[in-house]
Curated annotation (Swiss-Prot):
Keywords: Amino-acid biosynthesis, Branched-chain amino acid biosynthesis, Isoleucine biosynthesis, Lyase, Pyridoxal phosphate. Pathway: Amino-acid biosynthesis; L-isoleucine biosynthesis; 2-oxobutanoate from L-threonine: step 1/1. NCBIfam families: PRK08639.1 (NF006390), THD1 (TIGR02079). This is L-threonine dehydratase biosynthetic IlvA. It is an enzyme of class 4 (lyase). PANTHER family: THREONINE DEHYDRATASE, MITOCHONDRIAL, THREONINE DEHYDRATASE, MITOCHONDRIAL-RELATED. The modification N6-(pyridoxal phosphate)lysine is found at residue 51. InterPro entries: ACT-like_dom_sf, IlvA, Ser/Thr_Dehydratase, Ser/Thr_deHydtase_PyrdxlP-BS, TD_ACT-like, TrpB-like_PALP, TrpB-like_PALP_sf. Gene3D superfamilies: 3.40.50.1100. Belongs to the serine/threonine dehydratase family. Pfam families: PALP, Thr_dehydrat_C. Its EC number is 4.3.1.19.
Length: 416
């Protein structure tokens, strides 16, 4: 098991390499939740993610002979950037396996940080599939595998986030009540828990997962790590089907509260962080802040830290993020509605169905002359979520056979 001393030893090496990211009180969030909300901005790290800490420390602990062979890793993006940065700085080669679904922004950043030292292999639809391929390649070629989370040196490196948090809080005269920490494979929360429970046991560590990838919750329920059959890859930085054995053992009797955050709430938080605070956070990075909403009554008057774990957000995803946020807020809805095949049907729909401030965001219709009615896909944006019930009443009067796509997961996922 990792001790606080091991985290401190890791920091002795890393402090000359990593950025000591700020711990800042945020007035907007503090006012919103009637608490003192501090943000630990690892999105301002050199690779815009905390992952540099564990990757660099793990590689630095290899022998000269091991490093001369080159290293191998698997990552959904941020760990890969940390490994690439370390490989470049330490002048070694790195073969990096990434899922085919990895955002282009993260792939290009890996190339930028690693330069000629890295070779990227895109394999598998998920991190877990890439990891299997990477481990096989590592064994076949006798190259050290740098695990993204289930490695003691990686965990110790990630734990230096906690060391900085408590040192910064002490300097500001703050006694911390709770720290909200993202969970993917569990490396960050394992390192933070190992350090904080030994040095600052009065501070509660709260684990936060994306609702579509609750692998640590599943491990808690089963009493050991298990593999989820399906995960939502939206929060790609924490979309892991199986948590680490070591990370699970480090936190399962110490972290008492795990929260699962809806991907729509994460999307809403990403937009809020950008528009209100000027912070660019990736989905995984925003998850800790999003979780505040789930226990807002419990945190009133408390000193709270949320870790912005990463800021590697692909700008091309913003449309999807906005869409998910609008759906979560109850403002955007999709229906299949049967339209009479006669002139003026759309005009009637607009005048009779839409409210004065509502809008049609999608309309797909194929006219069939041999039928009296034809199905139409309609997307509607409400000005106020409370108008939903009256909208449904009006749609039912227009077509009592309409279909609300919110209950159809396959079609809804295709649209959103």
């Amino acid at each position: 098991m990792i001790s606080a001393k091991e985290v401190e030893d890791a920091y002795d090496l890393l402090k000359a390499v990593v950025t000591k990211t700020p711990l800042q009180l945020d007035p907007y969030l503090s006012n919103k939740y009637q608490a003192n909300i501090y943000l630990k901005e690892e999105n301002l790290q050199k690779v815009r993610s905390f992952k540099l800490r564990g990757a660099y420390y793990s590689i630095s602990k290899l022998s000269d002979e091991q490093r001369s062979k080159g290293v191998v890793c698997a990552s959904a993006g941020n760990h890969a950037q940390g490994v690439a940065f370390a490989a470049n700085q330490l002048n070694i080669s790195a073969t990096i396996f990434m899922p085919v679904t990895t955002p282009n922004q993260k792939i290009s950043q890996v190339k930028f940080f690693g330069e000629s030292h890295v070779t990227i292999r895109l394999i598998g639809d998920t991190f877990d599939e890439s990891a299997r391929a990477a481990k096989a390649f590592s064994q076949d070629n006798d190259k050290p595998f740098i695990d993204p989370f289930d490695d003691e040196n990686v965990i110790a490196g990630q734990g230096t986030v906690a060391l900085e948090i408590f040192a910064q809080a002490k300097k500001q005269g703050i006694s911390l009540d709770k720290i909200f920490v993202q969970i993917g494979g569990g490396g960050l929360i394992a390192g933070i828990t190992a350090y904080s429970k030994e040095r600052y046991p009065q501070t509660e560590i709260i684990g936060v997962e994306a609702k579509g990838a609750t692998s640590m919750k599943a491990a808690y329920s089963a009493g050991q790590p298990v593999t989820l059959e399906h995960i939502d890859k939206f929060a790609d930085g924490i979309a892991v089907a199986t948590v680490g054995q070591k990370t699970y053992q480090l936190i399962n009797d110490k972290v008492k509260q795990l929260l699962a955050v809806d991907e729509g709430l994460i999307s809403q938080t990403i937009l809020e962080l950008y528009s209100k605070l000027g912070i660019v956070a990736e989905p995984a990075g925003a998850t800790s802040v999003a979780a505040l909403e789930l226990i807002k009554d419990e945190i009133k008057g408390k000193n709270i830290v949320c870790i912005i774990s990463g800021g590697n957000n692909d700008i091309s995803r913003m449309q999807e993020i906005e869409e998910r946020a609008l759906v979560y807020e109850g403002l955007k809805h999709y229906f299949v509605i049967n339209f009479p095949q006669r002139p003026g049907a759309l005009r009637t729909f607009v005048s009779d169905i839409l409210g004065p401030n509502d809008d049609i965001t999608r309309f797909e219709y194929i006219k069939r002359a041999d039928k009296g009615k034809g199905p139409c896909l309609v997307g509607i944006l409400l000005s106020d979520a409370s108008d939903y019930d009256s909208l449904i009443d009006r749609i039912e009067r227009f077509d009592n056979r309409y279909v609300n796509l919110h209950g159809n997961d396959s079609l809804y996922e295709l649209l959103v």
